């Protein structure tokens, strides 16, 4: 009897864990990752312009 009660709780507990994992990914990880990627690209462009000069025709 006790084993069957634990088995019925597992799907609810597993679903709750999946919802928590989704919220952590959606609210914390993806925003941080997207800001890091865009910031990294901006830094790369900025450093390349410092080294090679601004874009445009050579005068």
UniProtKB/Swiss-Prot annotation:
> Topology in the membrane?
Single-pass membrane protein
Keyword Metal-binding tagged: no
State which residue ranges cross the membrane: 19-43
InterPro entries listed in its UniProt record: NapE_TorE (IPR010649), Nitrate_reductase_NapE (IPR004448)
One GO cellular component assignment for this chain's record is: plasma membrane
Q: Which domain of life is it from?
A: Bacteria
Kindly indicate whether the keyword Cell membrane belongs to this entry.
Answer: yes
Sequence ranges on the Periplasmic membrane side: 44-59
Q: Which residues lie on this side of the membrane: Cytoplasmic?
A: 1-18
The UniProt function text for this chain reads: May be involved in mediating interactions between NapC and a quinol oxidase.
What is the protein's name according to its record?
Protein NapE
Annotated source species? Paracoccus pantotrophus
Question: What gene does the UniProt entry assign to this protein?
Answer: napE
